[in-house]
A protein has these predicted regions:
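Hinge/lid segment of periplasmic solute-binding proteins
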Residues: 1-41, 65, 92-95, 174-183, ...
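Extracytoplasmic/periplasmic solute-binding protein
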Residues: 24-36, 41, 63-114, 153-155
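Short, well-ordered alpha-helical scaffold segment located
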Residues: 30, 48-49, 162, 226-227
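Short glycine- and hydrophobic/aromatic-rich loop-to-beta-strand nucleating segment
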Residues: 41-45, 100, 203-205
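Short helix-loop capping/hinge motifs at secondary-structure junctions, enriched
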Residues: 48-58, 106-107, 135, 208-215
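Short helices/loops that flank or line small-molecule/ion binding pockets
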Residues: 49-50, 66-71, 142-156
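Glycine-centered hinge/linker elements that transmit conformational signals in sensory
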Residues: 67-70, 111-140
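C-terminal lobe and pocket-closing loops
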Residues: 163-173, 183-234
Length: 234
């Protein structure tokens, strides 16, 4: 894969994007892709159902645990992204990363050549994540869109892109749902850390390309705000 930072105008192009979108595409001094999309999780909730149950929007994970008995008593649950697998067959690690980052942990060593998944912070995050399923009975796999619409999962975490799906496929819910930041972890100083992992899809250029300059021009055009806005509308 071609190092895009080798192009003279790379930095001016990279400035289009948030730093967090470029970071996963970088290694040492090289950058091997331009972000095409970036998503991150937020907390969706049904205002009508939470109001009927007299439940407040949870600010922390402790708040989530406190509200679970009331939800489950009404045959409802809090939704986390599926813990089973991704469409490509891999494990869904988003929940683990969310809890890891909120507790001050890191996924990789500073040189990015090894993971830190055996660190005490990572082990604690993994233990808490699994306890949400084993001890508190959250669904391991479910359809958030359908169950949020039906009301059996009136609150849960999903990528912000669910906003568009709900607007199109559940027009009857207009005005009775909303979204906010995910529940966070309380720091030692009393503040709440609501860090979430992002997911980036990117465009790359193969190092064996015979026309790297033309490929670079195409990638710049495709990832521009004007082109992406037009693509999204059409």
């Amino acid at each position: 894969v071609l190092d895009l930072a080798s192009f003279p105008d790379y930095q001016s192009v990279a400035d289009r994007f948030h730093k967090s979108a470029v970071e996963p595409l970088s290694f040492e001094q090289g950058v091997y892709g331009l972000p095409e999309t970036q998503t991150f999780p937020v907390l969706f909730y049904r205002k009508d159902i939470l109001s009927a149950l007299r439940l407040a929007i949870p600010r922390t994970w402790d708040d989530v645990i406190v509200m679970l008995p009331m939800l489950q008593k009404s045959k409802m649950s809090f939704g986390l992204p599926s813990a089973i697998a991704t469409p490509t067959g891999g494990m869904n690690y988003k929940n683990l990363l969310l809890l890891l980052f909120q507790n001050g942990g890191e996924l990789y060593t500073k040189d990015a050549k090894a993971t830190l998944l055996d660190s005490p912070t990572a082990v604690d995050a993994f233990s808490f994540m699994t306890s949400l399923y084993t001890d508190y009975g959250l669904y391991k796999e479910y359809n958030f869109l359908n169950q949020f619409r039906a009301g059996s999962v009136p609150i849960g975490i999903s990528d912000y892109s669910l906003y568009n799906q709900l607007s199109v496929f559940a027009p009857e819910l207009e005005g009775i749902w909303d979204f906010t930041s995910v529940p966070g972890t309380v720091r030692e100083d009393g503040t709440i850390d609501r860090t979430v992992p992002g997911e980036v899809n990117a465009c790359m250029i193969l190092s064996k390309s015979k026309q790297p300059e033309k490929a670079w021009e195409f990638v710049k055009w495709w990832t521009s705000a004007e082109t992406q806005a037009k693509f999204g509308k059409e």
